[in-house]
């Protein structure tokens, strides 16, 4: 939620929302759910979507399959027009340098 707040401070002219991914089983999970939100946005007039997953350092099944394939399909089938996913940091040199600095603190 802090990440969302900081991003909102930088990008004041666009709507930014946090949703929660990876619920499993029948137990209640943090809300709003990503999948339900992606379905509902086109009905609220939001047809273009840019998604970022700052909770993930590297792309994985959740970002590649659940968000970029299943989520995109759900958004578009519900009336969305454009869906783009910003890749995670993955093997970006800045990301690797950050890990190096963090590890070097402890060795």
Q: What are these language model-derived features?
A:
Residues 1-107:
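Extended amphipathic ligand-handling, pore-lining, and cofactor/metal-binding catalytic surfaces
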């Amino acid at each position: 939620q802090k990440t969302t707040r900081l991003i909102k401070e930088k990008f004041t002219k666009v709507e930014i929302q946090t949703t929660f991914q990876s619920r499993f089983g029948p137990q209640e999970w943090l809300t709003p759910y990503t999948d339900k939100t992606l379905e509902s946005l086109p009905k609220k007039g939001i047809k273009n979507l840019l998604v970022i997953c700052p909770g993930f350092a590297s792309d994985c099944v959740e970002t590649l399959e659940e968000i970029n394939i299943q989520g995109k399909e759900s958004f578009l089938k519900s009336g969305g027009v454009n869906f783009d996913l910003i890749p995670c940091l993955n093997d970006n040199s800045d990301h690797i340098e950050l890990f190096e600095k963090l590890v070097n603190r402890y060795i």
